[in-house]
Amino acid sequence: MTAFKYKIYLTLLYCLMISQVQAQPQLNLPATTLTILSYVRWNTPNPISLCILNNSQLSNQFIQVNQQLKSAYQIQAVSLSELNKVMCNAVFFSTYTPREEQNIINNLKDAPLTFSSNNTECELGSAFCLYQNKTRTSFKVNLASLSQSQVRVDPRVLLLAKSTEP
């Protein structure tokens, strides 16, 4: 296969993948979250555990996308009462207000990296706040919360977040 044909093939494959993601907008949150996680330098050895708090349907979506992307993250649905009893390197909130998120984060024994899909202002609570912006998923970063998580995130992710704010 010539280099030109190979580039066309890759472009078509990319377009196909993008069309599938746009056809399934509910999968954008997990895909965006897992992509952000791939740019994190962790203080702990693999595998990294992502806990989806009080939302088993969203947890199933994360598991599906995790398998599609062939990621090695351990995805688990956890209830609030279990949160301090299980190992969570990252926590995804989808059913709490920013104030409730902050209260939960303040009471955690560890300092996981936190994500939310219900916190568009991103001034309180989670470090990464994902939201649907027309046909795509965007995110904001709460630097104060990110610094509490004690993980290092590639600065290019932070720049991307800044440029996607509405």
Question: Each PLM stretch: what is its role?
Answer:
Residues T2-K5, Q22-P166:
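Short hydrophobic alpha-helices and adjacent helix-cap/hinge residues
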Residues Y9-S19:
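Bacterial N-terminal signal peptides
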